Amino acid sequence: CLISAFVKVQGKSSSTPIIYIDGNGVMRWSDTRREASFFGVNYTLPFAHAYRAIGYLELDRKAAIDKDVYHISRLGLNAYRIHLWDVELTDGQGNLLENEHLDLMDYLIAKLKERNIHIVITAQTNFGNGYPERNIQTGGFSYKYDKCDMHSHPEAIAAQETYLHGLVKHVNPYTGLAYKDDPSIVGFEINNEPCHSGTKKEVKAYINRMLKAINKTGNRKPVFYNVSHNGYVVEAYYETAIQGTTYQWYPIGLVSGQTQQGNFLPYIDRYDIPFSDKVKGFDKKTRMVYEFDPADIMYSYMYPAMVRTFRTAGFQWITQFAYDPMDIAYANTEYQTHFLNLAYTPHKAISMKIAAEAARSLKRGESYGSYPQDTLFGDGFRVSYTEDLSE
């Protein structure tokens, strides 16, 4: 495991703390060996609808990023995750394109880095860039294959190897660092919500090929994989050298088409992982929530309670999906089922700020009982449906 990192910045060598994963699957800081805890958001402005919508308004995308990163920082968040739209970053063979999407991603990373916000990059989505509009053809390799063929078609696998290798070693001109060498980038998730259709042997072989492509760059950062999809091959995930496993949670559903009403605290009492006591090596890989959200509600009482439950289940990285860019948040056109922005949903945003404090202070693995007893937890945290309150 990594113990330290030596990073050259502006001609000076300095030792910068990084994240490593120990033999028990725990993320730790290299300088203190203390456990790490990250809480933050997904945010998509460099890509897809958010990118286009800022263009429709004829606004400066980098200025928009500046405002949003400032607000994200004000909320006390220290984590950022994104699934890159590979269709906007690649050609048909998986070669990384030097285009505006990559430039904006590089710029965003640099701005997050300035505010000590750490990053996990999910390298590919393997789906289109349209939602909620129509897909726009780009020539990217993922448009050539069905998502459920991406992990078995020989040419698709070869394109992914090319892409992952190019992405991980890409040098960010705003930081002067390759992604693989930037201490602010905690690690890489191979893909977003994979759709496997092969045998356990084939799935394991696919993951090992992706790991080889990444590691050939000299990467020593942790690599994560989604284990909450394709449960029939879950053992294969744990038989590979991935160091982190990823999960999501939408406890009250998605895309209801209306604002939901009611007390949803009983829905989030527990986060059960059905194979936690069945799969060999489960406790040897760190656990990350790549996406979560109590969707389609405007209440302010849910976020700290969800963090409480995630910490009980052993998660060290928790990122909500998704933070709305301020310049388009007034219309909530990006993901209508999700709505979070400091200026336009201030009560939910403050709940996120309180949740960030909970993520930092609550001990991993500690239980707080069941509802309603668990509405009081940690050192003075409280949530209430009747008061619509987080504190």
Could you tell me what each predicted segment is?
Residues 1-12:
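Bacterial Sec-dependent N-terminal signal peptides
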Residues 16-242:
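Active-site mouth of glycoside hydrolases
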Residues 53-58, 94-96, 200, 255-264, ...:
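Short, flexible/disordered intra-domain loops and linkers
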Residues 65, 204-209, 264-273, 300-305:
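Well-ordered, non-membrane alpha-helical segments in soluble/globular domains
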Residues 89, 129, 232-233, 253-254, ...:
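Flexible loop/turn segments at secondary-structure boundaries
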Residues 223-224, 232-296:
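Glycoside hydrolase catalytic-domain groove-lining segments
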Residues 296-375:
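Substrate-binding cleft of secreted/luminal carbohydrate-active enzymes
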Residues 390-391:
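Extended non-globular C-terminal regions
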